Amino acid sequence: MTTTQVSQLESTFCGANGLSLFYQAWYPQRTVKAAIAIVHGFGEHCDRYSTVTTALTQAGYAVFGFDNQGHGRSEGQRGHINRWQDYRDNVSAFLAQVRQHEPNSPLFVLGHSLGGLIVLDFALNAPQGLTGIIISGPPIRPVGIAKPYLVAIARILSGIWPRFSMDVGAGAETLSRDPAVVNQTEHDPLTHSVATVRWGTECLVAIAAVRRNIKQLQVPILLLHGSADKVNDVKGSREIFEPIAVDKTLNIYPGGYHEPHNDLDRNQVMDDVVEWLDNHLNC
């Protein structure tokens, strides 16, 4: 499997608060089975998903990715949102772009880490038109960030100084066991590790809402998590998986770090994703 691929479309669309958001698309060299929309994680961007785009296009899927506000090549203060609704609005606008390109194809949304939380929240609030969702390493139990004293401080600052920024990065070495991935991430000028206190408090509210409402999920879900994830504890994925009442699959990868799609067993991960997609095209 190759690890790089040239996108066949690059453009922008208008997101929340009028921000210009960058997106791109990759197409298979055959009839499109379905459209896959990628929502990336905190501090990264959609160009970091070459393993995913290559595997999925080779399997016949059209793949779309965008840089969320404050990330990558999109506008916005790094690591800041005014309110969680901004993320919902951005995903809604992004999926509208995907639909313009693939109006008749089944639509799946793949979210990793923060993107997984965003997609879970979106699917719980606006499931219409979604064929299924793939969630990777979601921050249901973020390691170290949600300590009570930090939460208390963040809530105070969020009200009086919402754009106060701090470094919350876990370190590239926690993302993958592959030294090449770690090195590439450390030297990637489009990644960052800065977040504002408002971003943090909004994320905590979203996590609580997903935990509270996950049993209401209406679309099929594939949940992926590395057993040795040092960023978001795998226990969080197990906890939300149990009450889900619809078609659900949980894959936990032994020894896997935070990014299953960029880890040592990424080929197996992508084989699992493709198999699940192929089995859910007509759901």
Mark where each language-model region is.
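N-terminal cap/lid segment of alpha/beta-hydrolase-fold proteins
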Residues: 1-28
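Active-site glycine-rich loops that stabilize anionic/oxyanionic intermediates
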Residues: 41-44, 227
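Catalytic nucleophile-loop/oxyanion-hole region of alpha/beta-hydrolase
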Residues: 43-45, 72-102
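Conserved alpha/beta-hydrolase
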Residues: 53-77
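Alpha/beta-hydrolase-fold enzymes
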Residues: 112-196
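Short beta-strand/loop motif that positions the catalytic acidic residue
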Residues: 217, 223-225, 229
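Short alpha-helix in the alpha/beta-hydrolase fold that links the catalytic acid
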Residues: 219, 233-242
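Catalytic active-site module of serine/aspartate enzymes centered on a nucleophile-bearing elbow/loop
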Residues: 247, 254-283
